[in-house]
Amino acid sequence: MKKKLLVLTMSTLFATQLINSNHANASVTESVDKKFVVPESGINKIIPTYNEFKKAPKVNVSNLTDNKNFVASEDKLKKISDPSAASKIVDKNFVVPESKLGNIVPEYKEINNRVNVATNNPASQQVDKHFVAKGPEVNRFITQNKVNHHFITTQTHYKKVITSYKSTHVHKHVNHATDSINKHFIVKPSEAPRYTHPSQSLMINHYFAVPGYHAHKFVTPGHASIKINHFCVVPQINSFKVIPPYGHNSHRMHVPSFQNNTTATHQNAKVNKAYDYKYFYSYKVVKGVKKYFSFSQSNGYKIGKPSLNIKNVNYQYAVPSYSPTNYVPEFKGSLPAPRV
């Protein structure tokens, strides 16, 4: 009887140890605090604070429903809808939130320009040329690259991403002494923590940042694109300007000319050549919008709309012909469902 009891006890201990061992392996496979799927080839490049990448077991592809791009435990993989489609979206190089595979940033093509990152550096780290994350906060990647409520963009045009949300490469200055401009963003450093999801349009304490020439590839397509609250954004080719508060007349900046050098057109008629909204959801013009803006008489209202093509812009956006005198009030209603 004692021998049987001893055998039973030893068997139980062995089974418990085996289960614990399997559980430990599964934890490693699940990568980052059981929330993310990590590409196998980039596990030591994408997550700087993930220190167990060397211990990650080799994954049997057949156990992952032939998903060759990700490291994930089988139980986690079952929670991912259509992993093959997900791999096409992320192009084998992204940290993917399990529940948000349908809302990942657009395709990432510069897969050969990755930078290996030391895992023991606690400071802000450049994961590759298009990702900047602050040490342990990289574990908190969620939809559309939002890390600890600090905005990060992965668009291929933005070679220089804000590090710690302070300007690292100053391009030029604007009238506001508190604003600084790096190559792509106007940032008020003291308000940098207010950067949020790109669909919230990068509004920092009512100071709106606009990247210049590639603005049409900046805000997430399909979302309410440009939200402006008491500010008018001026998209000028190869420049970065924001109009100061309308209440501060002495600080107003002149609205730049969009005059086409080859054809005699109204200065706002070709604005979309520099600020292309064709990727955004199409919104209708707000009723009575004309009473808020001054447009030239020659090209002021065509078919009841201002000369600027507002139909492809958010309700809050418009650029007057000359120095601004009014602004479109903040839209209080419900926007149409985004086209994703």
UniProtKB/Swiss-Prot annotation:
Subcellular location: Cell surface
Recorded superkingdom: Bacteria
Key words, A-Z: Signal
Keyword Signal in record: yes
Keyword Signal: yes
A single Gene Ontology CC term: cell surface
Residues of the signal peptide: 1-26
General function of this protein: Adhesin that binds to the host cell extracellular matrix proteins fibronectin, fibrinogen, collagen, and vitronectin.
The protein, known as: Extracellular matrix protein-binding protein emp
Species this chain originates from: Staphylococcus aureus
Lineage of origin: Bacteria, Bacillati, Bacillota, Bacilli, Bacillales
Gene: emp
